[in-house]
């Protein structure tokens, strides 16, 4: 289910496969966006995981974050300009995601919306589960 937006080296692709596998093992109801926790299931494990997943990926690769306002969706823009979205699969059908905003880490972890979404706690929980999963 690897979602690469531009070509990259085989070693980087392999690392992304490892990360994707660890993320899939790490996602859970508690790491999902609060209003989506009741709908979260193992059938759609990426549901509500975009922000915290993008933060974990940022821990390993750096870069910035892309945000689509229509779907309130966040994914990574790596330092080389490659866009990487490990949670794209949560959307059913042909959903077009355009970059409406470029964010930095502070934009995501601070502020009223981060507090309402309990972003820091969910991120720390996912980061802990991700470490245990072995990535």
Task: Label every model-predicted segment.
Residues 1-135:
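A structural boundary/capping signal
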């Amino acid at each position: 289910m690897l979602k690469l937006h531009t070509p990259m080296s085989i070693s980087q692709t392999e690392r992304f496969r490892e990360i994707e596998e660890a993320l899939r093992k790490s996602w859970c109801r508690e790491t999902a966006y609060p209003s989506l926790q009741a709908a979260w299931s193992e059938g759609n494990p990426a549901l509500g995981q975009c922000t915290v997943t993008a933060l974990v990926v940022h821990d390993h690769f750096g870069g910035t974050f892309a945000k689509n306002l229509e779907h309130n969706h966040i994914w990574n823009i790596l330092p080389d300009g490659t866009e990487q979205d490990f949670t794209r699969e949560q959307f059913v059908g042909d959903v077009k995601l355009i970059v409406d905003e470029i964010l930095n880490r502070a934009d995501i972890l601070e502020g009223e919306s981060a507090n309402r979404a309990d972003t820091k706690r969910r991120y720390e929980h996912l980061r802990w589960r991700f470490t245990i999963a072995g990535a």
